[in-house]
């Protein structure tokens, strides 16, 4: 990966696109899962359109994975040219406890890197350790490369992340997950009752934090990372309603680029 970091971005993206097209053909079980999800979420689209989205998704996945070569190993000057952080960036300033709502778009690590490069604030996140210790160490090192970043194991509880929030820090949270019925509630997602982790409203309430969506989009020149205004009157006293609202707004973000979401 260090070698790839030295190559022009167009070369890295082109190589990754080739791998993505090959995997789309060979990884049939995964392809069927993607196509099934697209059918559930976008039944109004034709089979041809959904298949094209599925193929694009495989390509974006491979491109985002190889992009981590330069995200985590290229000089800062290279990243400054390829990462465009814009929008309501003032939401990341000050000392108000802040939760970044970071949906699972392929550019999630690019977004985190862009924020880490731009703020002196404590910046925490939650991760699930990988079985491969070397891969886990490489990913963790990449994610803490810039800024005052700390990664906390989700199996160690929420105390460290809450402490960071209450101290005026930022929590990068990816709550659009399904960890099973014991940790989830069922709320609508594209018209289907989906098991959803209610961590966003709970962290916001416990940390007295505002919620700021940050949406990354892969572009030919790198990543466009848009900071949205903080949600108003969030959270409420109703965790289920707050989680349903999160899913509803997530649908809006996904609809702008469905092939970049996973």
Q: What are these regions, as identified by a protein language model?
A:
Residues 6, 41, 118, 145-146, ...:
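Alpha-helical structural context
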Residues 2, 37, 114, 141-142, ...:
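Generic structural signal for isolated residues within well-ordered alpha-helices
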Residues 76-83, 147-152, 189-191:
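Short, flexible loop segments at the rims of nucleotide/cofactor-binding pockets, characterized by
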Residues 26, 48-55, 92-94, 117-120, ...:
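Non-catalytic C-terminal accessory region of glycerolipid acyltransferases
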Residues 95-155, 178-188:
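Catalytic core of membrane glycerolipid acyltransferases/transacylases, capturing the structured
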Residues 1-102, 106-107, 137-141:
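Membrane-anchoring hydrophobic helices of lipid-metabolizing enzymes
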Residues 32, 132-133, 193-197:
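Active-site metal-coordination segments of metallo-dependent hydrolases
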């Amino acid at each position: 990966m260090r070698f790839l970091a030295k190559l022009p971005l167009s070369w890295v993206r082109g190589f990754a696109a080739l791998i993505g097209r090959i995997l789309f053909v060979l990884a049939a079980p995964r392809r069927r899962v993607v196509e099934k999800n697209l059918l559930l979420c976008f039944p109004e689209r034709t089979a041809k359109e959904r298949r094209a989205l599925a193929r694009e998704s495989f390509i974006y996945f491979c491109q985002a994975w190889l992009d981590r070569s330069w995200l985590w190993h290229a000089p800062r000057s290279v990243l400054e040219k390829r990462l465009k952080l814009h929008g309501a960036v003032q939401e990341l300033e000050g000392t108000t406890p802040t939760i970044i709502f970071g949906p699972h778009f392929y550019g999630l690590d690019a977004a985190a890197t862009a924020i880490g490069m731009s703020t002196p604030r404590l910046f925490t996140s939650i991760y699930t350790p990988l079985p491969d210790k070397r891969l886990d160490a490489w990913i963790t090192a990449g994610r803490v490369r810039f800024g005052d970043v700390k990664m906390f194991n989700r199996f160690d509880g929420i105390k460290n992340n809450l402490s960071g929030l209450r101290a005026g820090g930022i929590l990068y949270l990816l709550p659009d997950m399904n960890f099973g019925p014991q940790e989830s509630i069922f709320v609508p997602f594209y018209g289907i009752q989906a098991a959803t982790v209610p961590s966003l409203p709970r962290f916001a309430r416990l940390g007295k934090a505002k919620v700021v969506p940050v949406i990354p989009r892969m572009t030919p020149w790198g990543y466009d990372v848009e900071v949205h205004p903080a949600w108003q009157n969030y959270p409420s006293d109703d965790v289920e309603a707050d989680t349903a609202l999160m899913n509803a707004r997530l649908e809006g973000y996904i609809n702008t680029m469905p092939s970049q979401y996973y």
